[in-house]
Amino acid sequence: MIKIETVLDILKKDGLFREIIDQGHYHYNYSKVIFDSISYDSRKVTEDTLFFAKGAAFKKEYLLSAITQGLAWYVAEKDYEVDIPVIIVNDIKKAMSLIAMEFYGNPQEKLKLLAFTGTKGKTTATYFAYNILSQGHRPAMLSTMNTTLDGETFFKSALTTPESIDLFDMMNQAVQNDRTHLIMEVSSQAYLVHRVYGLTFDVGVFLNITPDHIGPIEHPSFEDYFYHKRLLMENSRAVIINSDMDHFSVLKEQVEDQDHDFYGSQFDNQIENSKAFSFSATGKLAGDYDIQLIGNFNQENAVAAGLACLRLGASLEDIKKGIAATRVPGRMEVLTQKNGAKVFIDYAHNGDSLKKLINVVETHQTGKIALVLGSTGNKGESRRKDFGLLLNQHPEIQVFLTADDPNYEDPMAIADEISSYINHPVEKIADRQEAIKAAMAITNHELDAVIIAGKGADCYQIIQGKKESYPGDTAVAENYL
């Protein structure tokens, strides 16, 4: 529960409060109202709910519907002129985050918080950190792939970073479940729409940056995308940064007065003797490590997670055991066909991650390579050109273009857009299962490989705005082994 006096104090302190409007009368103070719940979903309200009217798609009808269920108060950036009082604020999403924090008892103060950001690798690094901290502590984890608040039950997340009310609710559940740490992914969108507003992390990790999530409903430019990624650094007590990433110099300047560790070729924390399933580290993590996830970028993610966990109480032994134990569904999963050919299933869904995936596979597999790939509809449109230009440089790869969450677009039109940048023949098969079957049929022996990119462990296709059931790339590939 939360008193209205507390709500108003929080909003005023942060410069978010404008006024209360009740039946046309303006108020600066108010008392004798207590809220037993908070919500941004108009279908989940009672007479004791404080409701947040948020989002570009919010309609007055939602509010009127909530009032028929007994709703008596709401927060908004404007007066919707309905028959209940409104708390007017300058920024509804900032207000929601601060009120949620207080409503759930400030759970962020009772947990050690670790956050990862980057264009790619967030989920893998989060899994490494979870497995490392599980050796000697009781972590909770919020990830794109899986969320656990008790260390035993896992469920799929709807967003990379949950809405603030859901986030602080989950943190509170983690506290109730006697968790000691919380590891989470923080997207640029989370800062763009203030899902983590007011939250300070104990350690923030910046893995890498490449142009992505640039489009009409995401970030208008790379500058905007990079700026919102960097906000994690100024909202973390200590930071870990990949010194080999693009634009590292500006990050180095930004964090010079903070506790920090840099890893990569320019600093002490480096990777040596990199092999498929092992590597050595220098610097703070000096030693030899076993790893199940193939690829140098996964070793970089492991080092980033290790450095972060070292600051949060993990021992070097914990770090070695945790890295060795880590597997991630849909992230560099490897299957073997009856003819010995390898099938690599990975979430790689932008030009840079696909480039790294191809390089890793071609390092270990020197025969025929087939690639199954699509690009999402109605978002990340810049990826299509990136994919096409990349694949134009790889005439040795037999490309099968197919559907990958086409949404309201025609998957074959997306395939045509990708192939317009490719000067050699490609196959186009709308049905993803058929595309996988066709790609796997071209292999003959153990040096051949099939790369199935984009969906990872997702068991759905987004079509016409809805998640339609799909067996998942791993299950489909297993049918044709």
Swiss-Prot record:
<keyword id="KW-0133">Cell shape</keyword>
<keyword id="KW-0067">ATP-binding</keyword>
<dbReference type="GO" id="GO:0005737">
    <property type="term" value="C:cytoplasm"/>
</dbReference>
<protein>
    <recommendedName>
        <fullName>UDP-N-acetylmuramoyl-L-alanyl-D-glutamate--L-lysine ligase</fullName>
        <ecNumber>6.3.2.7</ecNumber>
    </recommendedName>
</protein>
<dbReference type="InterPro" id="IPR035911">
    <property type="entry name" value="MurE/MurF_N"/>
</dbReference>
<dbReference type="InterPro" id="IPR036565">
    <property type="entry name" value="Mur-like_cat_sf"/>
</dbReference>
<keyword id="KW-0436">Ligase</keyword>
<keyword id="KW-0132">Cell division</keyword>
<comment type="pathway">
    <text>Cell wall biogenesis; peptidoglycan biosynthesis.</text>
</comment>
<feature type="modified residue" description="N6-carboxylysine">
    <location>
        <position position="229"/>
    </location>
</feature>
<dbReference type="GO" id="GO:0047482">
    <property type="term" value="F:UDP-N-acetylmuramoyl-L-alanyl-D-glutamate-L-lysine ligase activity"/>
</dbReference>
<dbReference type="GO" id="GO:0005524">
    <property type="term" value="F:ATP binding"/>
</dbReference>
<dbReference type="GO" id="GO:0071555">
    <property type="term" value="P:cell wall organization"/>
</dbReference>
<dbReference type="InterPro" id="IPR036615">
    <property type="entry name" value="Mur_ligase_C_dom_sf"/>
</dbReference>
<dbReference type="GO" id="GO:0000287">
    <property type="term" value="F:magnesium ion binding"/>
</dbReference>
<keyword id="KW-0547">Nucleotide-binding</keyword>
<dbReference type="InterPro" id="IPR004101">
    <property type="entry name" value="Mur_ligase_C"/>
</dbReference>
<dbReference type="GO" id="GO:0051301">
    <property type="term" value="P:cell division"/>
</dbReference>
<keyword id="KW-0573">Peptidoglycan synthesis</keyword>
<feature type="binding site">
    <location>
        <position position="195"/>
    </location>
    <ligand>
        <name>UDP-N-acetyl-alpha-D-muramoyl-L-alanyl-D-glutamate</name>
    </ligand>
</feature>
<comment type="function">
    <text>Catalyzes the addition of L-lysine to the nucleotide precursor UDP-N-acetylmuramoyl-L-alanyl-D-glutamate (UMAG) in the biosynthesis of bacterial cell-wall peptidoglycan.</text>
</comment>
<feature type="binding site">
    <location>
        <begin position="118"/>
        <end position="124"/>
    </location>
    <ligand>
        <name>ATP</name>
    </ligand>
</feature>
<dbReference type="Pfam" id="PF08245">
    <property type="entry name" value="Mur_ligase_M"/>
</dbReference>
<feature type="binding site">
    <location>
        <position position="42"/>
    </location>
    <ligand>
        <name>UDP-N-acetyl-alpha-D-muramoyl-L-alanyl-D-glutamate</name>
    </ligand>
</feature>
<dbReference type="Pfam" id="PF02875">
    <property type="entry name" value="Mur_ligase_C"/>
</dbReference>
<keyword id="KW-0963">Cytoplasm</keyword>
<dbReference type="GO" id="GO:0008360">
    <property type="term" value="P:regulation of cell shape"/>
</dbReference>
<keyword id="KW-0131">Cell cycle</keyword>
<comment type="similarity">
    <text>Belongs to the MurCDEF family. MurE subfamily.</text>
</comment>
<dbReference type="GO" id="GO:0009252">
    <property type="term" value="P:peptidoglycan biosynthetic process"/>
</dbReference>
<feature type="short sequence motif" description="L-lysine recognition motif">
    <location>
        <begin position="404"/>
        <end position="407"/>
    </location>
</feature>
<dbReference type="InterPro" id="IPR005761">
    <property type="entry name" value="UDP-N-AcMur-Glu-dNH2Pim_ligase"/>
</dbReference>
<feature type="binding site">
    <location>
        <position position="187"/>
    </location>
    <ligand>
        <name>UDP-N-acetyl-alpha-D-muramoyl-L-alanyl-D-glutamate</name>
    </ligand>
</feature>
<keyword id="KW-0961">Cell wall biogenesis/degradation</keyword>
<dbReference type="InterPro" id="IPR013221">
    <property type="entry name" value="Mur_ligase_cen"/>
</dbReference>
<feature type="binding site">
    <location>
        <begin position="160"/>
        <end position="161"/>
    </location>
    <ligand>
        <name>UDP-N-acetyl-alpha-D-muramoyl-L-alanyl-D-glutamate</name>
    </ligand>
</feature>
